Amino acid sequence: MIVIEKVDKTPVVKRLVEIVERKGQGHPDYIADGISEWVSRYLSRYYLEHFGIILHHNVDKTLVVGGQAAPRFGGGEVLQPIYILVSGRATYEVRTKDGVIKVPLGTLVMQAARDWIKQHFRFLDPDTHVVIDYKIGQGSADLVGIYDLGVKSVPLANDTSVGVGYAPLTPLEQLVYKTERLLNSRDFKAKYPEVGEDVKVMGVRVGKEVKLTVAAAMISKLVKDKSHYLSVKEDVKKAVEDLASKVAPEYNIEVVVNAADKPEHGIFYLTVTGTSAEHGDDGMTGRGNRANGLITPMRSMSLEAAAGKNPVSHVGKIYNVVAQRIADKVYNQVKDIIEVYVEIVSQIGKPINEPKILNVEIIKSGELTGEVRNEVEAIAREEIEKITQITDYILRGEVSLY
């Protein structure tokens, strides 16, 4: 059932207060999300390559337990490694007409986790700074039976869940997202290699006044002394201020970098590896960014952890992606839309292209005419009809999940 309604509420951009957060690439929660998702992708590709279908799995319960480190200007060492536990459930043996085939679960999990760390960090060594472990409930599958049921049919929802999307992003939401992406960009790291990957951004707006708090871990061995640290910190601040002047010129923006620093007491945000996980900061899948890459308490949000869930039938993942696609298309293609929210609810056991309800909330100028309703409904139906394509987008890394 598709419901389209005009709602009478103040758009976020016009509210007095707005709060937006993003946990960046090296944050412990982001690490958990990233590893969960890569394990799912490695499993999915293995299943596809060897059995022609993606078999059941959900690995959306990764835990990152902080280690201990002793950073110092010009050096430092990791004293106790970060402990990463990947948990969930996956198919580990498959019965075929030729016999039982075992899936190398452990090898795939370890390889996925190591590869993710290597690709997203420059100074975190997955072999010496991290202990990777896994506790995955093991299931089996009857491939002959699966084919008899028809693997090409529309998957059935394996949960009763909700996915949420909205559009457009406010200037503050864009600024928070782009700030983290800037500081973790290849160009910025080439210019300022001292800046680590653990970047967290919190934006608070009251009227036209914005305070942007940026926590950026610094790489201790690349920072020779206090003055060097403060110089890089000032360069980070200026870079963010320059970005802010382009993304949100209508606001008065104050940028604060590493607010917990107390130089007079020798307290600086230094890390050996580039992540706060090296010294007691823990993380877990689903505790960080929502599927659009932001934490937005002023918006409707799903609390589902999209990362690590199977990309075929788990609506906690798929519906968040589809809801965002519908919201973006409605905002971009339908005239006079100010804001749009989309909520999609599944019913366990039903085909994923038959949601229990697909609700579209519209804030717009003027009336919600029959023509507008038809346009919105056509967009929603098209995306739901194409829902099985989402799996490929996810496996190719073409959609935001965290």
Curated annotation (Swiss-Prot):
EC number: 2.5.1.6
Name of a matching Pfam family: AdoMet_Synthase
InterPro entries: AdoMet_synthase_2_family (IPR027790), AdoMet_synthase_3 (IPR042544), S-AdoMet_synthetase_arc (IPR002795)
Domain of life: Archaea
Pathway(s) per entry: Amino-acid biosynthesis; S-adenosyl-L-methionine biosynthesis; S-adenosyl-L-methionine from L-methionine: step 1/1
Cofactor: Mg(2+)
Catalytic reaction annotation: L-methionine + ATP + H2O = S-adenosyl-L-methionine + phosphate + diphosphate
Gene3D superfamilies on file: 3.30.300.10, S-adenosylmethionine synthetase, C-terminal domain
Binding-site positions, ATP: G137, Q138, G139, S140, A141, D142
Single GO molecular function: magnesium ion binding
Keyword annotations of the record: ATP-binding, Magnesium, Nucleotide-binding, One-carbon metabolism, Transferase
GO terms (BP aspect): one-carbon metabolic process; S-adenosylmethionine biosynthetic process
HAMAP family: S_AdoMet_synth2 (MF_00136)
Function: Catalyzes the formation of S-adenosylmethionine from methionine and ATP.
Protein family (similarity comment): Belongs to the AdoMet synthase 2 family.
Protein name: S-adenosylmethionine synthase
Phylogenetic classification of the source organism: Archaea, Thermoproteota, Thermoprotei, Thermoproteales, Thermoproteaceae
Gene for this chain: mat
